[in-house]
Amino acid sequence: MSKRDYYEVLGVGRDASEREIKKAYKRLAMKFHPDRNPGDKAAEASFKEVKEAYEILTDANKKAAYDQFGHAGVDPNRGGGGGYGGAGDFGDIFGDVFGDIFGGGRRGGQRQAARGSDLRYNLELSLEEAVKGLTKELRIPTLASCDVCDGSGAKKGTSATTCGTCHGQGQVQMRQGFFTVQQACPTCHGRGKIIKDPCTKCHGDGRVEKTKTLSVKIPAGVDTGDRIRLAGEGEAGEFGAPPGDLYVQVTVREHAIFVRDGNNLYCEVPISFSKAALGGEIEVPTLDGKVSLKIPAETQTGRMFRLRGKGVKSVRSHAVGDLLCKVVMETPVNLNERQKELLREFEATLTGESKKHSPKAEGFFDGVKKFFQDLNS
């Protein structure tokens, strides 16, 4: 029998937020949970279906695969028998949402030592650093495994003992009306073990505050918004649990000359009136140094020139962007009398030939003249 759409199972739209998905799961899990429906196989099947949908849609990678490929994208063992994750323990994910309720007859229940928290480091780079790549040394404040007790939390030469209240289960059960309520053990706080002689350095926590230095290779071509994941470089886990990850969030500072758009770079290059009219060669900046750019005669201000391969190498492929140079004609300033006289002489030579030498300007003023004639007619 084919599986139902996971969004349909939870009764949410495909654009539902994680909070909406969690809320829908909580409502349905309460409805179909085996402790509320003892012996009801249909309710048990519905609970498993709801749980499976929740597990997929709250995992970013699995959700992306499901959205693109459907059930085939998240089947862990195509044809391997059993649904996603098998029958599983009803307590595994249900406990994540509901905490300590509905303990019932579920096995175990001991709280596992928590994985270390992920860390985020905001790294600001210059455009040159981002384009060329480099190795950066980062100082990261974190929680590291205690080197005296090796993360156990117990004094050297001793070890944790089984909690006498919950007998190592980490949870105790209480009867409330129709339900058996399972709560974290108040003695060991859900760990199942007691540290009678805590480590003198970490005071029984198993972790200590530390600033560590990491040498991180930043690949060429990174841009603002890119994120680099360093597996296992986050905070140490509790009592030997796996560490979290470190995420380096990249921000590239604005540049005085260049503006980046993807793999392309843009810049404005000022040119003189005479260079624009007569043509010639100018030097333009690139991230690899100056290069020569040929300017054709009669170049208008705002014209864009493309220098292929002078942009940014993509961080995700071998493609290299271009440098686009916009020439901007600069009006001469601080002229002496001789220079002004020459310009007046030049202006006089254009009298009566404006259509020939300035066709756009002439056309514009003809249009303005016609506009006012039509307005007054």
Curated annotation (Swiss-Prot):
Pfam families: DnaJ, DnaJ_C, DnaJ_CXXCXGXG. Keywords: Chaperone, Cytoplasm, DNA replication, Metal-binding, Repeat, Stress response, Zinc, Zinc-finger. A zinc finger (CR-type) spans 133-211. InterPro entries: DnaJ, DnaJ_C, DnaJ_domain, DnaJ_domain_CS, HSP40/DnaJ_pept-bd, HSP_DnaJ_Cys-rich_dom, HSP_DnaJ_Cys-rich_dom_sf, J_dom_sf. GO terms for cellular component: cytoplasm. CDD domains: DnaJ (cd06257), DnaJ_C (cd10747), DnaJ_zf (cd10719). One of its GO terms (molecular function) is heat shock protein binding. Its cofactor is Zn(2+). SMART domains: DnaJ. Residues 5-70 form the J domain. Zn(2+) 2 binds at residues 163, 166, 185, 188. Binds 2 Zn(2+) ions per monomer. GO terms for biological process: chaperone cofactor-dependent protein refolding; DNA replication; protein refolding; response to heat. It is found in: Cytoplasm. The J domain is necessary and sufficient to stimulate DnaK ATPase activity. Zinc center 1 plays an important role in the autonomous, DnaK-independent chaperone activity of DnaJ. Zinc center 2 is essential for interaction with DnaK and for DnaJ activity. Participates actively in the response to hyperosmotic and heat shock by preventing the aggregation of stress-denatured proteins and by disaggregating proteins, also in an autonomous, DnaK-independent fashion. Unfolded proteins bind initially to DnaJ; upon interaction with the DnaJ-bound protein, DnaK hydrolyzes its bound ATP, resulting in the formation of a stable complex. GrpE releases ADP from DnaK; ATP binding to DnaK triggers the release of the substrate protein, thus completing the reaction cycle. Homodimer. This is Chaperone protein DnaJ. It comes from Shewanella sp. (strain MR-4).
